[in-house]
Curated annotation (Swiss-Prot):
Organism for this UniProt entry: Xanthomonas campestris pv. campestris (strain ATCC 33913 / DSM 3586 / NCPPB 528 / LMG 568 / P 25)
Protein name: 2-dehydro-3-deoxyphosphooctonate aldolase
GO biological process: keto-3-deoxy-D-manno-octulosonic acid biosynthetic process
Cystines in this chain: none
Keyword set includes Methyltransferase: no
SUPFAM superfamilies the UniProt entry points to: Aldolase
Sequence similarity: Belongs to the KdsA family.
Length: 276
């Protein structure tokens, strides 16, 4: 599949979607995007910057949600033009899709909205590549009907993203079998290594996370075989305004990505045959 100006798939090297969870300021986004461009350029990784203008599903109603649509699009447009990288953001049911699609290169649907038929179709009808996150409550094989809805709009640029499955209260687990199962949708599969270590609502008024397991799950996913990796990162996760507990430190991204690219090359060298 053609994504931005590069090809993605199991016959292509791993690509990266990364950036801060939420747009905190113009300068932070430019700094992080610039550093990620430097790292990915050095390692030969195709890179898409991500950040959200509105986090509509925060645990607490008083938590920081972002700058909003107008200011958020200005920031994303600045990142795209000044840093020279494609950009991704997530959209919601109330989002003016065409307005967002005029700025960003890739649209993303939140996991909690994966079963909302009209929403999925409206996003995909905007004509941009779409990264559809699998709901924490959804079986991997149930992504096939979601993809069918998406492609019924005529948009063939659809990706599916694994971000963990609910496992009791305030906990997620990653079933690596789902990465193989979701290949049957015919779409590139992306693994979200940071939201997969989230502890939803685990801190009462906010979500917790187990950042130390990001490289564990990322390595496992790459070893199974994926097209892309999604990872939220921040210069100081302890001060991040959203999802800090599961964000990977920016100054440790290069070492993580270097390892993952080596694993990716080995995995894809040996193919993905199914065994009955």
């Amino acid at each position: 599949m053609k994504l931005c100006d590069f090809e993605v798939g199991l016959d292509q090297p791993l690509f990266l979607i990364a950036g801060p969870c939420v747009i905190e300021s113009m300068q932070l986004q430019l700094d992080v995007a610039g550093k990620l461009k430097e790292i990915t350029g050095k390692l030969g990784i195709n890179f898409i910057f991500k950040s959200s203008f509105d986090k509509a599903n925060r645990t607490s109603g008083t938590s920081f949600r972002g700058p909003g649509l107008e200011e958020g699009l200005k920031v994303l447009d600045a990142v795209k033009k000044q840093i020279g990288v494609p950009v991704l953001t997530d959209v919601h049911e109330y989002t003016p899709m065409n307005e967002v699609a005029a700025v960003v290169d890739v649209l993303q649907t939140p996991a909690f909205l994966v079963r909302q038929t009209d929403f999925i179709k409206n996003v995909c009808a905007a004509g941009k590549p779409v990264n559809i996150k699998k709901g924490q409550f959804l079986a991997p094989w149930d992504m096939k009907p979601v993809v069918d809805k998406a492609k019924s709009t005529g948009n063939e640029q659809i990706m599916v993203c694994e971000r963990g499955a609910s496992f009791g209260y305030n906990n997620l687990v990653s079933d690596m079998r789902s990465l193989s199962v979701m290949r049957d949708t015919g779409c590139p599969v992306v693994f979200d290594a940071t939201h997969s270590v989230q502890l939803p609502g685990g801190q009462g008024s906010s979500s917790g996370g187990q950042r130390e397991f990001v490289p564990v799950l990322a390595r496992a996913a790459v070893a199974v075989g994926i097209s892309g990796l999604f990872a939220e990162t921040h210069p100081d996760p302890s001060k991040a305004l959203s999802d800090g507990p599961n964000a990977w430190p920016l100054d440790r991204m290069e070492e993580l990505l270097e390892t993952l690219m080596e694993l990716d090359a080995v995995t894809k060298k040996h193919g993905f045959a199914r065994f009955a």
